[in-house]
Amino acid sequence: MRYDLVFEGGGAKGIALVGAYEVLAEQGHSFGRLLGTSAGAITAAFLAAGYSSGEMMAVLTERDAAGAPVFASFMGEPPPFTAQEVGQGAFRRLLGGVDLTFIPGFVEDPLKDQLTAAIARGGLTRNFLALVERGGWYSAHSFLAWLRAKMDAGTYNGQPRRFSAMTLAQFYTATGVDVAFCATDTTGGRQLVLNHRTAPACPLVYAVRMSMSIPLLWDEVIWRQDWGPYQSRDITGHTIVDGGVLSNFPLELFVSDAPFVTAVMGPKQNNPVLGLLLDDAAPVPSPRGLLARVTITPGDLSTVQRLRGLVNTMLGARDRQVMEAFADLVVALPAGGYGTVEFDMSEPRRNALLDAARAAMRAYLAAHPPLPAASGLAAPAAPGVKNLADTLATRLLTPPAP
């Protein structure tokens, strides 16, 4: 059976999505359309690029030369600031508005310049300046480099995989996979669904990068002119962040067949829809194996904990109405007690998360034998359900009034 798959966002917890898909593939099922947000966007990209569940598992459990999870490097130090960021950025302008009346002007301005430059060179102060100037405490440069490398690694249909430089239109032509990535345009105040229809000139790797850009954690992405328009609308210079800000689990986009939604998602396929949800309310059984040491240093602990708390709270606001309306289409993968940015996850904790996801998928498939469904539903829709999907999907995709 081919399923149209929706992958929820959840940061480091997203490895559970791979464990669940592993079971789906083992039981002979495959995918049609793919839709992902944040960590779900990463999973969708790898599937569309031809990675098997085993290959994805190997990639997502990689460790560096020091034995640390490669994902831990994704919270990288900010790259050096430009002279413009230091001399004319938001922080320097803020200082410029503070008048130190007891210091002569010819001394005050150079002093403020020196202070800003010192902050830009510091440790945590450098992260603070990155948050002010770039919208994120950490840099995602290492993630982007990693994703590019993986999109060019191995083979696809017997040929070297070479997807890293492709646009979304080129990627669709090369693979034939209808894949979409959710992001949020904070400048325009709207949800973006990035695919070969809506943003054909957008680079594949940046579509994924934008989808996973958790606000305040990673630096924002600014839409470039050479990425072309979004749905024929110029959004050059707009700030784009994680799609989970507006909807972390937009399953209704695959259920709805409203004309406005179809213009974004394309025509519905004769595949049942299946959403993989990371359920923070469902506890994960105790880890198997020996406990691993904590890799975060004490100096970083309070900052990391605060950011984790903020991010987990923000992205924990689930699309409850959608999940309740389409409960039969949702596989709830236990993720209770796991953090969105727990990229230093120990091997025993990771194994426990994967085991729980596999068990949840097996239980779902046993209870929901697959049935062909042109409606996108695994069974005939209850009265009003399709109308609800149309309403929710249209509301999500409609840009705000000027």
Predicted regions and their residues:
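Patatin-like phospholipase
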Residues: 1-37, 45-402
